A protein has these predicted regions:
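Conserved hydrophobic/aromatic packing and binding residues within compact polymer-binding modules
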Residues: 5, 19-20, 30-33, 59
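Short basic helix-loop element that most often maps to the first helix and adjoining turn
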Residues: 3-22, 47, 73-74
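DNA major-groove recognition helix of helix-turn-helix
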Residues: 34, 52, 60-63
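DNA major-groove recognition helix of helix-turn-helix/homeodomain DNA-binding modules
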Residues: 24, 43-58
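Recognition helix of helix-turn-helix/homeodomain-like DNA-binding domains
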Residues: 24-39
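Conserved amphipathic alpha-helical interaction elements at protein-protein interfaces in regulatory
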Residues: 7, 11, 51-54, 65
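Hydrophobic side chains within well-formed alpha-helices
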Residues: 1, 5, 55-56
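Short, charged recognition helix plus adjacent turn
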Residues: 60-75
Length: 75
């Protein structure tokens, strides 16, 4: 189960259907993403990370650090 996905959604007061609409999937599909029953496509992970302002690692419970990595600027 991806706890961070659920927590971020609930913190914004959104339903699974709201996020499913953002991703253009059915609510049951999004529910399966949160429960870890389905692999989340990378395109959906990118949308979710931008929407929530965090890293994909955080979304997938691979880190407890909410903020995304800082981008290094090219010199």
């Amino acid at each position: 189960m991806y706890e961070h996905l659920r927590e971020l959604r609930e913190d914004k007061g959104l339903s699974q259907k709201d996020i499913a609409n953002l991703l253009k999937v059915h609510q049951t599909t999004y529910s399966d993403y949160e429960l870890g029953k389905l692999n989340i496509p990378i395109s959906a992970l990118i949308k979710l990370s931008v929407f929530h302002g965090t890293s994909i690692d955080y979304l997938l419970d691979q880190t407890e650090t909410f903020q995304p990595y800082e981008r290094k600027t090219k010199k």
